Amino acid sequence: MSFTTTVKEELIHLSASDQTELSAIIKLAGSLGLANQSLNLSITTENAKIARYIYALIEDTYHIIPEIKYHQKTNLKKNRVYTVYLDKQVDKLLADLKLADSFFGIETGIEQQVMSDDDAGRAYLKGAFLAAGTVRDPESGKYQLEIYSVYLDHAQDLAQLMHKFMLDAKVIERKNGAVTYLQKAEDIMDFLIIIGAMSCKEEFEAVKLLREARNDINRANNAETANIAKTITASMRTINNIIKIMDTIGLDSLPVELQQIAQMRVANPDYSLQQIADSLDFAITKSGVNHRLRKINKLAEDL
């Protein structure tokens, strides 16, 4: 099951909001038809549970019994498209939800009452996501939540509504409409809270934190590997210089304090400067070891 489906199935198990939610669903997933000189309304979805939810929402709100139809896009079961079909009292429903102008392209944005009321705004966002929303699985590490609108005006109003809830929503035009989207993980989690998908918000956050922890561990491991490689490279340079001294003037020609450092370095090529300092039988700091190794390198280079 996709994360989008998980979110939507959590939403339909919440108590239905109100007519505002139904209004958003119909506006984004509905289409009008004409048969026998009367209007009919079709609301489409690819999820049978959402179709039943819309059916119940219409029945409970308006005491009208719709039909649920379905057809196959292909031979695969998952490509079924479900339609909640209504051919009675469509005019009344559209008028009550103030949707008539929307379907005839006269008023394609979001009603001002929804834009100005927080509860109505939450209900509208819930309905909009149920009808036309998608969200990437947080496991992908590429965070994106989108709601598709047929009209650019509606997509822009949707972004403005999200801005009211302090979400950094943006709009992009597509070939057959426009998309309102969020790309920040924190915004997506806040959106899930706003529409009531608390369990999915917790799941999203847990996956995000786990990914970040894994990335931190990988970065630390990479840094440690790089430091080890750097230590060994520097160590081999010094060891080659010590061998050069041994072959030319002999190690005994060096001061005692340099001889001890040289012997420790040759015996332990993978030791860090601190490990060399800790292994000597006299007190010396990490910088002291580094200073003496630089002296050895300089002596070898001058030979």
From Swiss-Prot:
Keyword flag Metal-binding: no
Gene Ontology terms: biological process: cell division; regulation of sporulation
Query: What does this protein do, in the record's words?
Result: Involved in cell division and chromosome segregation.
What taxonomic ancestry is recorded?
Bacteria, Bacillati, Bacillota, Bacilli, Lactobacillales
Similarity comment: family membership: Belongs to the WhiA family.
Q: What is this protein called?
A: Probable cell division protein WhiA
Q: Name one Pfam family in it.
A: LAGLIDADG_WhiA
**Record-level Gene Ontology MF annotations:** DNA binding
HAMAP family tied to this protein? HTH_type_WhiA
Query: Which controlled-vocabulary keywords does the entry list?
Result: Cell cycle, Cell division, DNA-binding
User: What ranges are recorded for DNA binding?
Assistant: 272-303
Q: Which domain of life is it from?
A: Bacteria
Question: InterPro entries from the entry?
Answer: Homing_endonucl, Sporu_reg_WhiA_N_dom, Sporulation_regulator_WhiA, Sporulation_regulator_WhiA_C, WhiA_LAGLIDADG_dom
